[in-house]
């Protein structure tokens, strides 16, 4: 937060990085959630996706100061809460590795196959949309791209929505200018 007035205006208390749930605890929550609806499902793909995402994002931090891996884990937990398949959850864990790390789409395809890499690539392409502009033609183009992605595989949109949901849940760490563009209820601290 830029100043104390902004903090009071939003009526929130910022957490110290030490207060965040550890990645290990979140990972165990993810596995437990998956086991509830797929008790016999082979989760080696999800375990591998977590290891690769954790390594790829190892040096990165979020604006809050927490390890970056917490974001993909929370996205994956949202997807697991929706009882998505293991390919979708793996793609949720990996959704930022091509965009934000040195990992390439080809490497991702080699490690996880074409289905997971297709989902990650689709989310990456949706990320390139202009979400914050008000111009009608940009909005129409964004909708066109989203409808095309939905026609190919609705899971791309579901992963992107889980990504946006987690980003909104951590909106208290956005710059004040960005916070002003969103309704107050979006950026209040809440469930991860």
Predicted regions and their residues:
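Active-site helical microenvironments for divalent-metal-assisted chemistry
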Residues: 1-192
């Amino acid at each position: 937060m830029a100043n104390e007035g902004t903090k009071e205006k939003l009526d929130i208390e910022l957490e110290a990085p030490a207060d965040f749930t550890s990645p290990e605890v979140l990972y165990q929550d993810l596995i437990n959630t998956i086991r509830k609806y797929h008790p016999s499902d082979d989760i080696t793909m999800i375990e591998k996706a977590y290891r690769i995402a954790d390594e790829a994002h190892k040096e990165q931090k979020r604006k809050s100061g927490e390890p970056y891996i917490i974001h993909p884990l929370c996205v994956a937990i949202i997807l697991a809460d929706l009882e998505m398949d293991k390919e979708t959850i793996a793609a949720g864990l990996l959704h930022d590795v091509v965009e934000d790390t040195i990992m390439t789409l080809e490497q991702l395809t080699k490690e996880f196959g074409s289905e997971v890499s297709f989902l990650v690539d689709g989310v990456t392409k949706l990320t390139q949309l202009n979400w914050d502009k008000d111009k009608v033609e940009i909005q129409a183009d964004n909708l066109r791209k989203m409808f095309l992605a939905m026609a190919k595989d609705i899971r791309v949109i579901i992963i992107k929505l889980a990504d946006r949901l987690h980003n909104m849940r951590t909106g208290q760490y956005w710059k004040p200018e960005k916070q002003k563009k969103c309704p107050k209820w979006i950026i209040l601290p809440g469930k991860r």
